[in-house]
């Protein structure tokens, strides 16, 4: 996604998707993880897939994006949880202490709209960007709970070790138990490999301020 491209807000313009052009960048800010927001996202995905004549991949791409959004929302909840408990997520001793209680208590807050509002008040966000260039749909998710280098290394290790494994093998033999088996990310990559001919169909990285997950769909 070109950083110099002007960004069109889908949130602010009801008719933003009526005439999608090559190279345009569209932004959708996920205000909350409500069913209404998810339904809006599905409609957005449908419009972009129509543009590249790949409507048949609608359900699978929605599944991938929902998993990525879920991961982003959970990351924001985790960060907000640590902040509200005066714990530094980057300090090993605080991280270990915080994760013990977070796994039991923190994720239950995902449906607590008061906590969701608190997350927004802290300035934490999930933003989605969509652009089509030369027939390739790029969907980029950004959230400002920055993934650590260690976590990125774990994700890439999981992806590497999952190559040439069947879905059954992946579920029967989890690769890394750190904060879950990471099967969601692995399945996203496998799904994208089936519906996209782009060699770099999935990537996750981090800047100093954001975690960036990119999906490329090329018929």
PLM regions and their residue ranges:
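Conserved glycine-/histidine-rich ATP-lid loop and adjacent helix of the Bergerat-fold HATPase_c
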Residues: 185-201
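Short C-terminal beta-strand
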Residues: 208-219
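A short beta-strand-to-loop motif within the catalytic HATPase_c
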Residues: 79, 201-208
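Bergerat-fold GHKL ATPase/HATPase_c domain
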Residues: 1-122, 153
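Conserved catalytic-core segments centered on acid/base and nucleophilic motifs
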Residues: 61-64, 72, 126-132, 139, ...
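Short beta-strand element(s) in the Bergerat
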Residues: 22-27, 126, 135-139, 211-213
């Amino acid at each position: 996604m070109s950083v110099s491209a002007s960004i069109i807000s889908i949130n602010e313009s009801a008719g933003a998707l009526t005439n999608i052009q090559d190279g345009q960048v569209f932004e959708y800010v996920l205000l909350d993880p409500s069913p209404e927001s998810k339904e809006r996202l599905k409609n957005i995905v449908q419009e972009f897939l129509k543009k590249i004549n790949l409507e048949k991949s609608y359900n699978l791409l929605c599944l991938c994006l929902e998993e990525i959004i879920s991961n982003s929302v959970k990351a924001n909840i985790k960060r907000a949880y640590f902040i509200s408990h005066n714990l530094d997520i980057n300090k090993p001793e605080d991280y270990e202490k915080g994760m013990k209680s977070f796994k039991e208590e923190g994720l239950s807050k995902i449906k607590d709209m008061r906590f969701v509002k608190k997350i927004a008040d802290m300035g934490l966000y999930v933003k989605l960007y969509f652009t089509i260039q030369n027939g390739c749909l790029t969907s980029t998710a950004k959230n400002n709970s920055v993934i650590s280098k260690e976590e990125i290394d774990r994700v890439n290790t999981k992806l590497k070790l999952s190559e040439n494994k069947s879905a059954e093998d992946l579920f029967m033999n989890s690769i890394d138990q750190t904060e879950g088996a990471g099967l969601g990310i692995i399945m996203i990559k496998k799904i994208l490999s089936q519906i996209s001919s782009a060699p770099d169909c999935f990537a996750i990285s981090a800047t100093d301020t954001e975690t960036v997950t990119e999906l490329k769909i090329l018929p």
